[in-house]
């Protein structure tokens, strides 16, 4: 494990290491602040290192703050981040992860400037390259159920080999293997 100070300063390293250990982002959809700590403890104990609280959950910034402070070894942050102001609010709450259903260059640049890992939602090679050019640490292929493993394989053939691609939306235990064989690095589940 990294020292706490180093973990707090290099979110991208924590992202890479967490994704290698457990290729799943736990999406804590609808979680309340009261539920957040016991759920996060169970997930971290089970090996999860990437925890996302969607901003459309009840009082998400309180949950993010509680989880981030209780589990500094984990990369904790928000999903459904659509605007720059939300990036700043997540950062102020202690979050270091920004996940979006779409690609917004301003959101990516704001997150990167704050040393936060940013995973914007993309569906096409054009969006994927634009997101990477803006500084995204990885790509959220969303909704994955609308994109076949064959399309994922074609996209991976042209994307940089180092680009991390996560499938989110409609992912099931039954289709994970096909997506991984096509080049997916991880999944968002929740």
At which residue positions do the language-model features occur?
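Hydrophobic faces of well-ordered beta-strands that scaffold small-molecule active sites
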Residues: 24-28, 51-53, 76-79, 98-99, ...
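Alpha/beta catalytic cores of nucleotide-metabolism and tRNA/nucleoside-modifying enzymes
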Residues: 8-10, 25, 112, 116, ...
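Glycine-rich phosphate-binding active-site loops on the catalytic face of alpha/beta enzymes
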Residues: 101-107, 140-148, 184-190
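Short, Lys/Arg-enriched N-terminal segments with co-localized hydrophobic residues
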Residues: 1-7
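Glycine/Thr-rich beta-alpha phosphate-binding loop at enzyme active sites
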Residues: 48-53, 91-93, 114, 124-153
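Conserved N-terminal beta1-alpha1 strand-loop-helix module at the mouth
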Residues: 7-96, 103, 113, 173-174, ...
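Short acidic active-site motifs
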Residues: 63, 85-86, 106-107, 126-128, ...
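Hydrophobic, well-structured mid-protein blocks that either form specific transmembrane helices
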Residues: 87-127, 131
């Amino acid at each position: 494990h990294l020292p706490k100070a180093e973990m707090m300063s290099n979110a991208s390293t924590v992202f890479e290491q967490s994704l290698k250990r457990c290729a799943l982002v736990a999406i804590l959809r609808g979680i309340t602040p009261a539920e957040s700590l016991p759920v996060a403890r169970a997930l971290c104990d089970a090996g999860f290192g990437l925890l996302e609280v969607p901003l459309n959950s009840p009082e998400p910034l309180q949950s993010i703050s509680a989880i981030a402070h209780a589990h500094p070894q984990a990369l904790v942050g928000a999903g459904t981040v659509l605007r720059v102001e939300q990036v700043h609010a997540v950062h102020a709450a202690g979050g270091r992860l920004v996940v979006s259903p779409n690609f917004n260059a301003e959101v990516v640049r704001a997150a990167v400037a704050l040393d936060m890992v940013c995973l914007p939602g993309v569906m096409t090679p054009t969006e994927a390259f634009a997101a990477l050019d803006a500084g995204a640490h990885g790509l959220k292929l969303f909704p994955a159920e609308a994109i076949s493993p064959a399309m994922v394989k074609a996209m991976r053939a042209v994307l940089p080999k180092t680009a991390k691609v996560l499938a989110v939306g409609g992912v099931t235990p039954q289709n994970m293997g096909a997506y991984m064989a096509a080049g997916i690095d991880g999944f968002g589940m929740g």
